[in-house]
Design a protein with these regions (language model features):
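His/Asp/Glu-rich metal-coordinating catalytic cores
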Residues: 1, 5-171
């Protein structure tokens, strides 16, 4: 929805890791294109039913223009947003570019530290970086969709992957 809020007038800075920016550049263009195709299909159907047409939430031009607002940051380096707010990104090890975002907010002589994290990766992964410790915080906002799940040992996961590759390549000739 970043291009959508841009299309509605947002012109603020968007802070993210370099990998997140690179992924966004591709994905936002792609979603704008897919959305345009879906809207064309939907509108043809609505025309036949003599019902109102719809417009895409945003287009490829919005997706391209919003990229000018992106500011990349390095992991583990504090960045001052303004006099009262500092932000730091810490590698969460979940996927390329993922981060725990820590805010330090000073207001009326008080300092509060707030951290937000989505998914957190596994320790000692062979594919992704190990999650790094983030600065202490007063408040933690944590996405926890799969928080009650235990993951298989990495060796078990590798054996499962090997089994799928073996079955696909050797037995199904894929």
């Amino acid at each position: 929805l970043i291009p959508y809020i841009y299309s509605r007038g947002f012109r603020g800075k968007i802070y993210c890791t370099a990998a997140s920016r690179d992924l966004c550049e591709l994905m936002l263009q792609d979603t704008a294109f897919i959305q345009a195709q879906d809207v064309r299909w939907y509108n043809k159907k609505m025309d036949r039913l003599r019902k109102p047409r719809i417009k895409p939430l945003y287009d490829t031009n919005h997706a391209q223009q919003v990229m000018k607002l992106f500011r990349t940051v390095e992991y583990a380096k504090p960045y001052r947003i303004d006099e009262e707010i500092e932000v730091q990104f810490t590698n969460s090890g979940h996927m390329l570019g993922s981060a725990v975002i820590s805010l330090t907010i000073k207001e009326n002589g008080n300092t509060k530290r707030i951290a937000y994290t989505g998914d957190v990766g596994r320790l000692h992964s062979h594919i992704l970086s190990t999650p790094q410790a983030f600065p202490p915080c007063d408040y933690l906002i944590c996405e926890s969709t799969y928080g009650n799940r235990l993951h298989d040992d990495e060796l078990v996961s590798e054996e499962q992957l090997l089994g799928v590759v073996e079955e696909t390549c050797m037995y199904k000739k894929g």
